[in-house]
Amino acid sequence: MTWLFAALALAAISGMAAEQYGVEGSTQSTVRVLIYEDLQCPDCADFRSMLDQQLLPRYAATVRFEHRDFPLAKHAWARKAATAARYLEEAQPGLGVSYRKYALANLRAINVDNFNQRLSDFAKGHGLDPAQAVAALDDQRLAALVENDYQDGVARGIAKTPTVLVNGRPFIVTFAFEDVAKAIDAELAASQ
């Protein structure tokens, strides 16, 4: 009987964990695109453009796009940005995704020296307390969420960003819209 309670608890935790991510598109879809991203990565910025210009317009009503954090050690402020995105998503659902877009669109303007000020300005511009947003960078619970994503990615064999998984099928760093769309279309057809 103990194993049953453990299994139920694990299922409940797994269900809750899915909602901690920034999600775009259909929250109810069984077709999931996991996006392992580093918010200081130029290739991730390119993928963000593909997501905004091609994937979301075509699939927002039918596919769940989940953002996962995979900050690379070579990027000085990527982990802070991932933590900030987690805080902002909790403070105001959807704002974490907006921040991810902002960080990727401004990755050449943001640096270690101005990171906190840029975060503060973003938070203030969205009606949040800027000091709380900056203080959240030291929140160990949020840092653990980012680290959990990173470790999950490592366990899946991910080493580069962006890595996109279409119901488990990987696309790594640079890939064409047509290839991702073909995989999504196949998963949508299989789910019918």
Can you name each region flagged by the protein language model?
Residues 31-32, 62:
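Alpha/beta-hydrolase fold active-site loops
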Residues 37-124, 190:
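Structural alpha/beta surface segment adjacent to cysteine/selenocysteine redox centers
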Residues 15-31:
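A short beta-strand-turn-helix
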Residues 24-26, 34, 58, 157:
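Generic structural signal for beta-strand residues in well-ordered domains
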Residues 2-12:
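Bacterial N-terminal signal peptides
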Residues 36-38, 48-49, 120-192:
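C-terminal cap of thioredoxin/glutaredoxin-like
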Residues 18-22, 51-53, 150-151:
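A generic local structural motif
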